[in-house]
Structure formats: C-alpha cells, structure tokens
C-alpha cells in the first residue's frame, strides 16, 4: 500500500512498537501518522506567517500602530494558548471525538488569521493595533485547543518510539515554508507593502482550514475515553469551593513528583524560547538594519528546522530527557559565547553574528521543543496524558508571564542583562532535567 510505503520511508519503526496501542488503532498507524504529519505541518507553516516575534511586529510598524502594542504580541500569543488548558482538560476528557477538538481549534485559528488579514487591508494606526491584538488573543485561545488535543490523539494512534519522528517530519515540512518565506522577504527587502502582508495572512488562514479537513479524517480507536471519570470531572464538583480543574491541577502538582520536576525543567527551558528576540534587539542597536533584516532571521529559523527536524525527532525518541538537558546547556552556552564576542572589538560588529546566533538558538529551541513534547506524551497514558499536557501548559503560561516580566525589566537596563539571566536559567534547567526518569 502506498500509504504504508510512504510512512515507512519517513518513520523508522518496528512491528513490536504497536504493542502499547489498542488493537483497533494498530491497522491505521500509517494512515493516521501521515494525516497528523500533514495537518501539523500545515499548522506550523501558518505559524511562520503569524509569528509574534518577527512578522507581526513588522505588520504593526507598517500599519502605524503605537509602538507599545508590539510589547503585547508575544505574551498574548504564548500565554493565551497555555493558560486555558487546565480548564479545557475536563471538557476534552469528556469527549469521545477528541480529534474534533483539534479541528475546532484549527478552524478558530483560520478565522482569527483571516481577521488579521482584513485588519491589515482596511485600517491603520491604533485601530489596526487593537484589531491585531484582539485577533491574536482569539488565535491563542483556539491554539490551546489544538495543543491539548494533538498530544492525546497522537498518543492513542501512534506508538511510542515513532511520535518524536512524526513531530520531526512536520517540523522539516514547515521549515521549508519558512525558508521560502525568508528568501522572499529578503528579496523584497524594505519595499514589502502591507498588501503583501495581508495576502500572506490570508494564505495562512487557508492552511489552517485545509489542516482541519485533513485532521478530521483520522481514524480513532474504539475506546477513546473513560466516560464515567471524564463526566464526573467535567460536570460534578459543584460542592467544592473552587472549580474541579483547579483542584486536579493542585493535586497533580502536589502529589506527582515526576510531573512537578518536568514542569520545573520545562519552565527553565524558556531560555531557548525567550532569548531570540533579545538577540534581534541587540542586532538592531548595532547596525540599524531595522526591518530589512527580517527575511534573514526567518531564513535562519527555517534552515534550522530543515536541519534539526528529523534529527531531533529521532533523538527525542531515543531519549527525550537527554535531549532536554543538552538543549538547555547548548542555549546557555550560545548566549554566553555571543555576549563574549560582542565584548571583543570588531567581532561584535560583524553583520553575520546576530543571524548566526539566531540560527543556533532556533536549532536548539527546536530540540528542546521536540524533547519536552515527546517526554510528556511518553510519561503518561490515556486521560492522564491529557491532564499532564493541560496542567503543564497552564503552569507554563503563568511562568512565561513571570519570566517575561522579569526579563523585560532587565532589558530596560540592557538586553545583555536579560540574556545573562536566561543563560543562568538554562543551566538550572539542565540540573533539574538530570533528576527526571528515563521514559523512552
């Protein structure tokens, strides 16, 4: 069968891998795996356009939105997609068709991205800024649905040992889009107009719509939920002083030491996620290239995805714990080396240095991202996996706001101080990661 041959080409596996899946899911591993690759790749490709670190700040500037609005982009995008997940979890667990949750989330992202395109094409100034921020908030909420559902569906339809590779393949596919976009922006340079940005956003919206259609065709196993437990979680607990999901989240943090250490390690891994914008900011201070360098940074991110996607996917399947540790240390080392080179007369002014550092950090962040995604899928089973993902992401949303506030305060004194703090957090993350058990 062509489907099986293509899957065998993309994913290394053995027949014994499927023993951890239900018998109903085993005949459809290849088809389900390819459908998830395609849908996730389309979503990731759209992310390259709706990028709160690069493209959206450029759009804000082009529309004449107040500069202060740019500072809200990353917190809204990241925290907005994480904070609601513990509240969503009981409702997701109560559903038998969990792929429908992903489809709904993808549809919501398509609508929000189309709204951004409409704003870009029709209004300017502070009205445009408010419109983009509101659309981004809706986008982030919809993204929280796809995030919580995707790992549950992946865990129920694809065996352990293949999940990291699937995520790696989707990363490579989306990276090709990033390279294409980066080359295009680099070619257009400073002449890129708002109309082109609006068209790019409209195209990105269609990617999410197509991804939703593909994901809807995934064949799920017959036993999808533990209905009694899920229903009780979602509908009962009316006598408690606080909502049921808050009680569950607090209990999970209190009683599960492995989960607690994983969240701590993941929180400290923010070094690879939060440091690139400060590298970009330092580069703008150095030579004043401004927006003309956007394509180069997007290109660097895309090349990193092409190089690291499948490699890190296989490393995550081999040991997601060791990959988390290595990525954390590599990010910290990269920051220290970069700041050291900037202190050397002549070396710190090299035009290639910021893009090279951005490339390395993007590569390292890819490894950290695949590692923690694979680890949380492998560490739990069934509805416990859904709860792990939801509570971890909600806690990460809180941590992101806290660390973001601290680094923003340090950046007021100098971007280098923020980078030094993030480098220290990365070292601490590696130490905590060593205490995690192997799950591969």
Positions of predicted regions on the chain:
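Helix-loop boundary and gating motifs at the non-cytosolic
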Residues: 2-83, 258-298
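Multi-pass alpha-helical transporter architecture, strongest
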Residues: 6, 117-120, 207-219, 338, ...
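Substrate-agnostic recognition of the 12-TM MFS/MFS-like secondary transporter fold
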Residues: 35-53, 73-89, 105-109, 135-218, ...
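Short hydrophobic/alpha-helical segments at membrane-entry points of transmembrane helices
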Residues: 36, 127-135, 261-262, 349-358
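Cytoplasmic membrane-interface "Motif A"-like loop-to-helix N-cap segments
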Residues: 93-107, 317-331
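C-terminal ends and interior cores of transmembrane alpha-helices
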Residues: 106-125, 330-347
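Flexible cytoplasmic inter-helical loops of multi-pass small-molecule transporters
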Residues: 219-248
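C-terminal transmembrane helical hairpin of 12-TM major facilitator-type secondary transporters
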Residues: 322-368
